[in-house]
């Protein structure tokens, strides 16, 4: 299988604190007229959002502007949250089929849809959008399986693949899959600043009304939106860009805004009480892993790595790192994202077993390890000392260093022999397939390390991952079974510490209805719900 694993590290540094604090609002609709003290009168929703805008180009977009993009643009399909009655919600494609071998995917394109610039959407517009994504998207690698794409008539798009792949999941990606007006694509091809002028060319429920860089984004309901059942809830969404979580909390509790996407986790309960609201939790795609440097003794011995895995106080890490809003990981695949399975074994906190394994491996007196974590990640700063203290109880001294993520990442890639012994990583898949992403990116063998910073190489694991990747589009249950076997190998060989999956945490103000958070779009705030609020 030809898999590209050069995944961009979007937000690995700058956006991480926001992602840890409070998840974006998954969807909202107005509460009863006059309910509470929220200012949602006259069809205006005010929001304090942590999301910055790195680009308004929907093709190049690969960062926190996803919060806005999902309201302006649409993909072929939306991937629904775990537990939904249907796996997908049709968007630009009203239906789709795949051949038995998973090599041909046919999408029936919705008629009567217009782009915000007045152009009509048809199959050719879809083809041009995906070809642009293949060529220059920030997440262009998601289209690696695509060999060719064609419009066989005005309403039919056919994709031909190099190997069986889950194009439904790819087509529902939050990055690299937006359908864009051909007129705007042509204009941006000759002017790379075209979109930065405040132009938008989507089909979504909102248009970009105005943008004050670093300060404010105003979205306006699109009058000709095709989906009458999911028409924009608000006429205007007025968003203040507020990177500081404490400031956002103050704006919310002072009723300067109706909703805040970022509130410090330690204050969640107090904020909910002040707002007469509720705290809601859900799956998120955010997963914490601790790489072992498997090239250097004593971590080249699986028994040593297993011992250290038993010496991690997992629940304490969750309680201290994310205020209890998390669950112990079943490997590096986050809960709710394919191919997550609770059949994958977990290590328990067992210091006696850890000591016995170390002694059996010839290290009864312990040793010293160097651990690094991202200095810009507040959760890591809170939970890493717990790892140090626990390892000390089995005679392992840990020297901890906080570094900017990109600095430690570059060092680990360029000089494995002298890199850290343990590297704490915060990771999430680009789209809703953590088999082709997490399991590949984090632990698949490679000649030159990019993101497999354990440097672990295992031909049997690689074969399972590669095989599963070619089955996901044609036989997902078979792919799942192979991925579970591969994750069992990760447990047994322990090239990393599988710490925890962070949860999405939302404060729901009393005057707003909030649909369930969608872990497939963690950086996107939908102001018109994909599914009705419960």
Language model features with spans:
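N-terminal lobe/hinge region of extracytoplasmic solute-binding protein
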Residues: 48-100, 131, 201-202
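A bilobed periplasmic-binding-protein/Venus flytrap-type ligand-binding module shared by bacterial periplasmic
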Residues: 79-80, 220-224, 284-307, 311, ...
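Gly/Pro-rich hinge or "lid" segments in bacterial periplasmic/extracellular proteins
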Residues: 81-83, 174-229
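Aromatic- and charge-enriched surface segment that lines or borders ligand/interaction sites
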Residues: 94-137, 152, 158-163, 298
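Surface-exposed binding/hinge segments that line
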Residues: 108, 141-186, 210-212
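Detector for C-terminal structural segments
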Residues: 212-216, 312-338, 379-386, 413-534
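Ligand-site clamp/hinge motif
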Residues: 223-270
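Append "and occasionally in soluble cytosolic enzymes with long acidic Gly/Pro-rich linkers
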Residues: 300-389, 394, 457, 532-533
């Amino acid at each position: 299988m030809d898999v590209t694993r050069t995944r961009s590290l979007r937000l690995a540094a700058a956006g991480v604190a926001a992602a840890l604090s409070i998840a974006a609002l998954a969807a909202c609709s107005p509460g009863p007229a006059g309910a509470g003290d929220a200012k949602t009168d006259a069809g205006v929703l005010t929001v304090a959002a942590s999301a910055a805008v790195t680009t308004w180009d929907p093709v190049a977009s690969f960062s926190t502007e996803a919060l806005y993009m999902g309201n302006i643009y649409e993909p072929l399909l939306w991937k629904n949250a775990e537990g939904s009655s249907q796996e997908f919600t049709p968007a630009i494609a009203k239906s789709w089929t795949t051949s038995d071998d998973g090599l041909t995917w046919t999408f029936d394109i919705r008629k009567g849809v217009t782009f915000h610039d007045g152009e009509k959407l048809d199959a050719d517009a879809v083809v041009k959008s995906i070809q642009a994504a293949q060529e220059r998207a920030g997440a262009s690698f998601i289209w690696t399986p695509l060999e060719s794409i064609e419009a066989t008539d005005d309403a039919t798009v056919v994709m031909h693949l190099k190997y069986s792949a889950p194009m439904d999941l790819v087509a529902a990606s939050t990055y690299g899959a937006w359908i864009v007006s051909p007129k705007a694509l042509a204009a941006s091809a000759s002017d790379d600043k075209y979109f930065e002028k405040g132009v938008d060319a989507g089909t979504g429920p909102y248009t970009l009304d105005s943008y004050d860089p670093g300060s404010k984004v105003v979205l306006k309901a699109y009058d000709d939106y095709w989906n009458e059942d999911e028409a924009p809830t608000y006429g205007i969404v007025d968003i203040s860009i507020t990177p500081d979580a404490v400031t956002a909390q103050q704006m919310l509790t002072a009723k300067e805004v109706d909703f805040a996407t970022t509130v410090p986790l330690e204050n969640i309960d107090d904020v909910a009480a002040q707002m007469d609201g509720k705290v809601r939790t859900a799956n998120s795609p955010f997963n914490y892993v601790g790489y072992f440097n498997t090239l250097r003794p004593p971590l080249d011995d699986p028994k040593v790595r297993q011992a250290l895995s038993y010496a991690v106080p997992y629940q304490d890490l969750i309680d201290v790192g994310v205020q209890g809003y998390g669950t112990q990981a079943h490997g590096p695949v986050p809960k709710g994202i394919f191919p997550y399975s609770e059949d994958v074994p977990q290590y328990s906190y067992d210091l006696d077993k850890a000591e016995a394994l170390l002694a059996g491996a010839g290290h009864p007196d312990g040793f010293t390890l160097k651990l690094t974590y991202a200095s810009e990640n507040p959760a890591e700063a809170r939970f890493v000392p717990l790892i140090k203290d626990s390892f000390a109880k089995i005679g392992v001294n840990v020297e901890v260093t906080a570094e900017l993520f990109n600095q430690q990442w570059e060092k680990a890639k360029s000089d494995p022999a002298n890199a850290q012994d343990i590297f704490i990583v915060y990771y999430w898949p680009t789209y809703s397939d953590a088999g082709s992403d997490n399991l590949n990116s984090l632990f698949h063998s490679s000649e030159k390390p990019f993101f497999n910073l354990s440097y672990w190489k295992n031909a049997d694991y690689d074969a399972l991952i590669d095989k599963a990747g070619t089955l996901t589009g044609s036989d997902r249950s078979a792919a799942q079974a192979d991925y579970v076997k591969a994750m069992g190998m990760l447990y047994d060989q322990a090239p990393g510490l599988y710490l925890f999956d962070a949860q999405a945490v939302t404060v729901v103000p009393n005057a707003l209805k909030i649909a369930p958070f969608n872990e497939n779009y963690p950086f996107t705030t939908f102001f018109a719900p994909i599914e009705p609020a419960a």
